[in-house]
Amino acid sequence: MSQAFTESVKTSLGPNATPRAKKLIASLVQHVHDFARENHLTTEDWLWGVDFINRIGQMSDSRRNEGILVCDIIGLETLVDALTNESEQSNHTSSAILGPFYLPDSPVYPNGGSIVQKAIPTDVKCFVRGKVTDTEGKPLGGAQLEVWQCNSAGFYSQQADHDGPEFNLRGTFITDDEGNYSFECLRPTSYPIPYDGPAGDLLKIMDRHPNRPSHIHWRVSHPGYHTLITQIYDAECPYTNNDSVYAVKDDIIVHFEKVDNKDKDLVGKVEYKLDYDISLATESSIQEARAAAKARQDAEIKL
């Protein structure tokens, strides 16, 4: 069918639809219709897609978000993350995808505390410390850091195969007046994302592996600053250069160091250590970048 048909669908939204809804739905309709025409979709193709979408919903529950997994596999979450966190302040810590395993309200621990409520024999403990600052290096006291990770078997606390408490390997920490934080965790491990559902089927169609590199998740917030959602990646992990969800960025690849006799406070407690500083962009810089991007987009539409 012609572009005239597509235009009739795009302009059919009622007067109470918000401007943002009109913009997004019209754009979605245009791209979906173009996709169908470009690939000459058949009814069989369309039904396969409908079933795929249905299975995403059926596979999802409070412990698993299959929709996020599918978006990750096609790189959509990484793209949206980049657009969301665009800023003129180039020296802030890079963001990364949230992923499907975030849980709010993790336990608050004092600095130096451990998020390891229950360990398994293959877990390797690590101590992480650093400072949270603004992009000029000013310490940000009172910043909130939420961290979470999987165990060495590759399972997060809400997954059925994770043998541990609900908030195992999750915790919240508050920086001191000088912006310092510290906590005990595990040296991260790589793992395959769940591939027993439609996300896994899509990976097989794409002839891709399901493995994510070793990483720790972070969510860092402070009043007046843009909330940073990111991950740090182990430089020694073979999947750091071949992430199944395309989320790795060069400046959030880190090197874990072996604890030695110079680290008297850590010897006998953990095997590895990491010093890692975080820099937050102001919320205003993010909003200014978004406004500039929107202005550029509007100008392109008028051309």
Swiss-Prot record:
Regulation: Inhibited by Ag(+), Cu(+), Hg(2+) and Pb(2+).
Keyword Iron: yes
Top EC category: oxidoreductase
Thermal activity characteristics from the UniProt entry: Optimum temperature is 25 degrees Celsius. Stable at temperatures lower than 40 degrees Celsius.
CC cofactor: Fe(3+)
Pathway annotation from the record: Aromatic compound metabolism; beta-ketoadipate pathway; 5-oxo-4,5-dihydro-2-furylacetate from catechol: step 1/3
Taxonomic superkingdom: Eukaryota
InterPro entries assigned to the protein according to its UniProt record, in alphabetical order: 1_2-HQD/HQD (IPR039390), Catechol_dOase_N (IPR007535), Intradiol_dOase_C (IPR000627), Intradiol_dOase_core (IPR015889), Intradiol_RC_Dioxygenase (IPR050770)
PANTHER family: DIOXYGENASE, PUTATIVE (AFU_ORTHOLOGUE AFUA_2G02910)-RELATED (PTHR33711), INTRADIOL RING-CLEAVAGE DIOXYGENASES DOMAIN-CONTAINING PROTEIN-RELATED (PTHR33711:SF7)
Descriptive protein name: Catechol 1,2-dioxygenase
Higher taxonomy: Eukaryota, Fungi, Dikarya, Ascomycota, Saccharomycotina
Gene name for this UniProt entry: HQD2
